[in-house]
Amino acid sequence: MLKKTPHIILMSLLSSSLLLTACKKADEPAKTEQHQTNSSTDQVMEKLNERPVKKFATTADDAHDIALLEDYDRRFTEMSDEMETELEKMHEAGTLTTEFEQKRTLDNVRSALTMLKDLDLKTEQGRYIQGLLYQYWENQEKHINDKQANKDEQVNQLADYLQAQNQLKYWKASQQH
């Protein structure tokens, strides 16, 4: 299940991609610019959707791990939403600084990593999803600290996050049969 935070990340990535493409092609005719922008967006979407869901054997611990991963997702989403609300209020009040926003974002990422580490998952599929999510957030922490992120790297890392979400959704649906 995709929540608000992944949508924001995806929209930011797509917007950045479109903005960069538009800036690079500003001196070309409008028709060519639109074709390039659409092509770039299509490439990003293809990259995000290219990995199929992996098949795992059903185990007695599947429901346990699904519940833990969904609980992690719910708690992390609530925490992220609260942070976004706090930052929006500070922005509206004119008290938000770039440094504070970056610090809170880094705190949020580190919280995701800690929450993921604390999950006691018992299945191979659960640990696979946990690993994808952990890798995604670890890379986000690196990019926040480095302040440099290659667009292709961002797409690959977002693909990891979305793969984890799709895997969990598929896994949960397969348990209901």
Residue ranges of model-derived segments:
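Bacterial N-terminal signal peptides that target proteins for export
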Residues: 2-10
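Hydrophobic alpha-helical segments, especially transmembrane helices
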Residues: 4-5, 25, 141
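Bacterial N-terminal signal peptides
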Residues: 11-17
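C-terminal motif of bacterial Sec signal peptides marking the signal peptidase cleavage site
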Residues: 19-22
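Immediate post-signal-peptide N-terminus of mature secreted/exported proteins
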Residues: 26-100, 173-177
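Intrinsically disordered, low-complexity regions enriched in Ser/Pro/Gly/Gln/His and often acidic
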Residues: 65, 69, 129-130, 164
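Long, amphipathic, charge-rich alpha-helical segments that form helical bundles/coiled-coils
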Residues: 101-161
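Short, low-complexity, Pro/Ser/Thr/Gly-rich segments in the mature regions of secreted, periplasmic
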Residues: 161-177
